[in-house]
Amino acid sequence: MARFPNPAERPYKLPDLCTALDTTLHDITIDCVYCKTQLQQTEVYEFAFSDLFIVYRNGEPYAACQKCIKFHAKVRELRHYSNSVYATTLESITNTKLYNLSIRCMSCLKPLCPAEKLRHVNTKRRFHQIAGSYTGQCRHCWTSNREDRRRIRRETQV
């Protein structure tokens, strides 16, 4: 992996790093900043799709694998949870329409699309303020959490 000693010249998004290295998302190899393992191809795409920033250690670029993202998102939630509000309350607090707010998934940190925000409104789910930012749940984490709860309920039924 190429080194970027000058902070002004560092790309901070994965597609920009690919351009700087003259490679593609399919061919790039990058390590996790937390566990130091090389990201798998699916994790590279998920990192790019999540619109997360690349971090640099000693001029070397690092991303984060999905396991570490989920772990550190949970730690962030447990340490920095502030409050939970419904969408209408969130709009009145911020004086901004829900569509224009930048809200990420509390589990995988992916930005929520308008359909995922609308799902929170329709099902009367709350958004959570964690570390100063509002979060919800993306479609993938919503369904996987629901399946986990169902499995636990089935296992505990007598």
From Swiss-Prot:
GO terms for biological process: DNA-templated transcription; regulation of DNA-templated transcription; symbiont-mediated perturbation of host apoptosis; symbiont-mediated perturbation of host ubiquitin-like protein modification; symbiont-mediated suppression of host cytoplasmic pattern recognition receptor signaling pathway via inhibition of IRF3 activity; symbiont-mediated suppression of host type I interferon-mediated signaling pathway. One of its GO terms (cellular component) is host cell cytoplasm. Its main location: host cell. A motif (PDZ-binding domain) lies at residues 156-158. It is found in: Host cytoplasm; Host nucleus. A zinc finger (unnamed) spans 32-68, 105-141. Plays a major role in the induction and maintenance of cellular transformation. Acts mainly as an oncoprotein by stimulating the destruction of many host cell key regulatory proteins. E6 associates with host UBE3A/E6-AP ubiquitin-protein ligase, and inactivates tumor suppressors TP53 and TP73 by targeting them to the 26S proteasome for degradation. In turn, DNA damage and chromosomal instabilities increase and lead to cell proliferation and cancer development. This is Protein E6. It comes from Human papillomavirus type 70. The gene is E6.
